[in-house]
Amino acid sequence: MTWTTRVLSAGDLPAVGELFAETMGGRRPFIHDQWKFGRNPAGSALGMVAVDGNRIVGQYVLLPVELRLGREVVLGAQSVDTMTHPDYQGKGVFTTLANACMKLAEDHGVEVLYGFPNPNSYPGFVRKLNWDHTGDIQSWVRLIRPSGQPRIPRIGRQLANVLARVMPRGRLLGMDLHVGFPSAEVLDRLVALWESQQGVCRVSRTPRWMQWRFDPDSCMEYEWVVAFRGG
């Protein structure tokens, strides 16, 4: 097997979809890749691919994102969709693509990188790419219908549903909930609230970014719920 590397292009997206199916065991809509890689308000995806003949056998991608550090905004990038075809794993594809892509990002003015690697790619990021583990992601999950979870014994599923309905649901007193995409005025108010907080490193949540991030073309079935208190 011989493979070479080159910069990812928009024309590669169908082949990237095939690689995703081969490595992840499922397919995702083509419109998702167009949304993620080509319509990001911070810039198109920066990526490197490994090619063997007419096949893409590996990919490393950095997604540009504006990061707010206090009052300063810097260009960062998030590592996403790292993939190596099973037949090419253990041959240096991941490391070669990652190093080339990080150099590409540096040339485009990217100053900060971050990512959320899965257990398979985590060792490579830390040991081979010299990334630091700065913390773990906390997940907040609430089961709406526990009886649908296979881990719950059949005999206790109906009881689990009853308990879920009586569990505390949080305080909504004095709040007005609106479902649906908020108006430009509401988005501006949210942005002003976030920007007033100091000493926080986070994605710069501009209205344009939020419209893109939760766009229906992401195919993630996001739903906007806005809570108002006191107007």
Give a label for each model feature:
Residues M1-F37, P41-D52, I56, L62, ...:
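Short amphipathic alpha-helix that is part of the acyltransferase structural core
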Residues G199-E223:
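Non-catalytic substrate-recognition and accessory regions of acyl/acetyltransferase enzymes
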Residues L67, F116, W131-I152:
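Conserved catalytic-core motifs of GNAT/GCN5-like acyltransferases
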Residues F37-V49, G53, G58, V126, ...:
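A short helix-loop-beta-strand connector motif used in the catalytic cores of GNAT acetyltransferases and
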Residues L67-S79, Q89:
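A conserved beta-turn-beta hairpin within the catalytic core of GNAT-like acetyltransferases
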Residues A105-N118, K128:
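Conserved GNAT acetyl-CoA-binding A-motif
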Residues Q59, G231:
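Short glycine-/small-residue motifs
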Residues T84, Q89-K103:
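Conserved acetyl-CoA-binding loop-helix of GNAT-fold acetyltransferases
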